[in-house]
Amino acid sequence: MTIERVLSHKRAICYSGFRDGQSPDTGVFPSKEEIASDLRLLQADWEALRLYACDTHAERVLAVIEEFGFDFKVMLGAYIGAEISNPNCPWGGEHADDVLLENKRRNQDEMERAIALANRYNNIIDVVSAGNEATVDWTDHLV
């Protein structure tokens, strides 16, 4: 069986429901009601959503899809931080050792959340992408 048969083509969009004053960096995430409002608008034109991290936002999006019965598939991203400094990164890929060590711990937590969410929402999540930001040699997110 080929991957094309397993994963059919879908109209997809990257989704981030953050509004003014909301940010994963500050821990202020869109509410389920805000997410549901967005998904009502998106459902007319899109079949799949791309999420970039396994954080509270992703958990809420998946819960809303399930609770409201939205017909979306999700490509879940696991956001990976640098575990290795990269002096070739044009915008500064050098990190202190303690930062790299903390990133390694966070990366492990992120991967565990990705697995847990993929298992919990296996009827919604059809792809997990880990470390998209770490796949090029010029990144500040080397692993």
List the model feature ranges, each with a label.
Residues 32-57:
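Catalytic domains of carbohydrate-active enzymes, especially glycoside hydrolases
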Residues 19, 55, 134:
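Flexible, active-site-proximal loop/turn residues at the rims of small-molecule/cofactor binding pockets
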Residues 16, 52, 131:
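Conserved residues at the C-terminal ends of beta-strands
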Residues 18-26, 45-47, 96-104:
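Acidic/glycine-enriched edge-of-secondary-structure segments
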Residues 61-143:
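Substrate-binding cleft of extracellular glycoside hydrolase catalytic domains
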Residues 1-37, 41:
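Boundary/entry segment of secreted carbohydrate-active catalytic domains
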Residues 13, 49, 128:
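Conserved, mostly hydrophobic/aromatic
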